[in-house]
Amino acid sequence: MASAASSLPLLVSSLLLALFALGAHADVKRYQFDIVMSNVSRLCHEKAMVTVNGSYPGPTIYAREGDRVIVNVTNHVKHNMTIHWHGLKQRRNGWADGPAYVTQCPIGSGGSYVYDFNVTRQRGTLWWHAHIAWMRATVHGAIVILPAAGVPYPFPKPDDEAEIVLGEWWHADVETVERQGSMLGMAPNMSDAHTINGKPGPLVPFCSEKHTYALQVQSGKTYLLRIINAAVNDELFFSIAGHNMTVVEIDATYTKPFAASTVQLSPGQTMNVLVSADQSPGRYFMVAKPFNDVPIPADNKTATAILQYAGVPTSVVPALPQTMPATNSTGSVAAFHDKLRSLNSPRYPADVPLAVDRHLLYTIGLNIDPCETCLNRSRLAASLNNITFVMPRTALLQAHYYGQKGVFAADFPDRPPARFNYTGVPLTAGLGTSLGTRLSKIAYNATVELVLQDTNLLSVESHPFHLHGYNFFVVGRGVGNFDPAKDPAKYNLVDPPERNTVGVPAGGWTAIRFRADNPGVWFLHCHLEVHTSWGLKMAFLVEDGSGPDESVLPPPKDLPKC
């Protein structure tokens, strides 16, 4: 079923890690990303799609903590392009962050741009992806940041490791799918399959037998799997038949280890797990299936890959996991996330802000706005504090840096315009929003608490939110309406999970805290691309401080122009 070539990514990873061990003194890593059209075939369908260097998923970036990374991106396709280095903090250097019209204008057809950044006090698994329209469906890849030379993992050293990139596949051109949905004012068509390392696996009908990723393992050895949810619109469960996983890291921050038979990741999140090849030699399915906790149409397609013990014939039928959570199992997801704790060791402390300077409450809404050219003369929209974000025509960071007027207003409200029973009966009237390019101005070094509150406008739904430029601590979460008088007493201020992307439960809330010590303009958005395209986003404008290293760096000379 799986060819020997399917194990090449693990071999390449092992060789690169060995080279890093030999050349630990190297501190500059250079990469060339060519944005090209490639013909790719899955499920009996071939299509031309945008890729980096002709590969899907794209190449892995390898670096060490403390390295400088230089990536020259050359755009050979007709589409505009940007690349976001998801989870890298880019201190003072928003010019390298990548979201189109937020920190940079796009790289036009035939153009190039050099992303030049330092990996400072970060180590673990992150990822990169296109950050314009829905291009990230095919333009994405892993980032592996090894600990600084001589610094061990804070868990047993694995014998080997591999990246596991979870994604989605559309037969149609993804940009066409998004554009058709936008023109109609409706939700775009769902994907045709989920993938593991770009392949749907043999359980999906239609020519999928040869499109199966296989990870070869040796009995008795332990492997570090670097799992990335690169799906466009789906939260996913991941499980390996017959094998437990030990969670040791989320979003490139170490955790207190714990065992799990199934893990759950929202789009944008990463997770490192240890897996021991301690079962009877055989072939075992790795499974990725959607988590969906609301009664609306959703993907329910399962992707599979194979954990292949060395020496076992490929004719052996792989075993499936005996039990996995139901697609709508909110209880198992909540129980899993309750186990996530920062390592909080002397080397890796959890520096949770205990005092708060700014308290923010953002309500998450799914809305309906008028649209004379759309089906039913209306379009689906989304909002924070009832504001649907409008993307500007020039980059926000450039407008801020150069003092350009009329691009944005720095008046995003700290609270919703009206209080109501956010998670009560579904609200079907008064669903319109206000439109605006509105930012929230934050003083340098201020401590911020942001409560993200889901609402029942149209329907409750879980939302993964990603904050650029920062990690944050997830100090609390709950079901129902956030109670500012009672809920903070239940916060975990000792060892809460530290993340860059967090899920807000359907009909519930999530509270995060961070210190605004990174000046610039930083995007906050839902990482379900369908919701982001509807306007579920905003940005923080973190002011410069007074110190010599507390202001935005000057822009690079090759920064693209709008």
Curated annotation (Swiss-Prot):
Protein EC: 1.10.3.2
GO cellular component: apoplast
Region forming the signal peptide: 1-26
Gene Ontology MF annotations: copper ion binding; hydroquinone:oxygen oxidoreductase activity; oxidoreductase activity
Glycosylation sites: N39, N53, N72, N80, N118, N189, N244, N300, N328, N376, N386, N421, N445
InterPro entries associated with the record: Cu-oxidase-like_N, Cu-oxidase_2nd, Cu-oxidase_C, Cu-oxidase_fam, Cu_oxidase_CS, Cu_oxidase_Cu_BS, Cupredoxin, CuRO_1_LCC
Similarity section: Belongs to the multicopper oxidase family.
Protein name, UniProt field: Laccase-2
Protein encoded by which gene: LAC2
